Each structure stands twice: as C-alpha cells, then as structure tokens.
Design a protein with these regions (language model features):
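Metal-dependent de-N-acetylase/amidase catalytic core
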Residues: 1-127
Length: 127
C-alpha cells in the first residue's frame, strides 16, 4: 500500500507514488509474469479519508490490531513525536490515524455493517 494523499503540502506522498509507479511500470514492461498479480492500493493519509463511495477495499481492525498499527507507526522515526511537517493539527500522527480509522469504521456501521474498532480504507490504482 502507498499513501494516496497527493495534496500533501510537502510533496512527499506524490514523489513516493511516482517512484513506486515507475518501478511497477518498468517491471511490467520487462514482461515479468508475477507483476500481473500485483495491485497497488492507496490509503489516503493521516489527515483525510477517501469518500465512502470511492473506497474499493476496507480492512476492519480489532482494538488489538489498532494497537499493533500504532506500534508500527512508532517504528518510523519520521512519524514519532513531533513530525517535521506537522501542519495545523497539533495531534501526533498516530492519534490522527486512529481517529480517522475509527471514523471510517463508524461510517460503515452507520450503513448497517458490523461495527469494528477501526477500518483502513483503500483505493486501487491501475497501472
């Protein structure tokens, strides 16, 4: 998966997206068979979520999985404590992510689906 928040004011997400996309296109053009089974899934980022009608895959998370995700975020130095590009939101990265994922789970519950602790949403990028 890859961040699909191309409105990132510092351009990090779009630079990474283009690097991954070019690598995938190169592998595809070289005819490697395994690439036919690879899909590129984009998550939105810490600040926003995809609109519910845009989401193509949603991964439900239990409270334990939310904690594991938080610990995964802590592993990345750029996402710990005060991040270099904080923006106007004073919360730490993991706090924004957990609220976003909980809100997505609530949206699905409001539609009549099972209510989970959190849900990560993805959109597939065709390359």
């Amino acid at each position: 998966d890859l961040a699909g928040d191309f409105a990132d004011p510092h351009g990090t997400h779009i630079v990474c997206f283009h690097a991954v996309l070019e690598a995938l296109k190169q592998i595809k053009s070289e005819g490697d068979e395994w690439i036919k089974d690879c899909w590129l899934w984009l998550y939105k980022g810490a600040w926003e979520e995809w609109n519910i009608d845009e989401i193509q895959m949603a991964i439900p998370m239990s409270p334990d999985q939310v904690l594991r995700k938080r610990h995964g975020i802590f592993i990345h130095q750029s996402q710990k404590d005060m991040v270099p590009f904080q923006g106007s939101d004073a919360r730490e990265f993991w706090q924004r992510v957990e609220v976003r994922n909980a809100n997505t789970a609530r949206l699905y519950a409001d539609l009549g689906l099972t209510h989970y602790a959190a849900m990560e949403a993805f959109v597939r990028w065709e390359y």
